[in-house]
Amino acid sequence: DKGKDILMSILLLAMMLPFVAIMIPLFKMFTSWKLVNTWIALALHSISTPFMIMLFRQAARSFPHDIIEAARLEGLSEIQIFFRMFIPVMKSTYGAAMTVTFMNAWNNYLWPTIILQDNKAITMPMLVANLKSGYSVDYGMLMLGVLICTLPTAIIFLCLQKSFANGITGAVK
């Protein structure tokens, strides 16, 4: 248990590391995997962040051990306990993780600028940044771009609002 706490402390220290500090090694890794200019490279770095690991760890620690013991007494295997009991109870945590991951990936500007080197594929924040480049700025078009860029995030948050709130607070039903 002490080793797990040390590992978690190292993980929490990784949360303090700015993305710019790990951007070049990440780019080299994705280049060696031949994932530059792919949508996989955009999503892959957002999935396993230290925050997500901490969120799921805390939610798993709050899972009642009495339920697990009762399931073992009923004869369920560890896999059955995981799929029949753990995952359904953790739906709110999964909802919160999906919301945060989508918001981070959708609103990210720096990583797509680095990893998408072809002008054929750009993200919405990159498109909005392109709208304001030049000598004259059409603010109406720029605000429309910002609104369109914001809509998917707002819709997903509103749809998963209850799951997001329960998952962040660690509510277990």
Each language-model region and where it sits:
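A structural signal for multi-pass alpha-helical bundles of membrane permease subunits
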Residues: 1-173
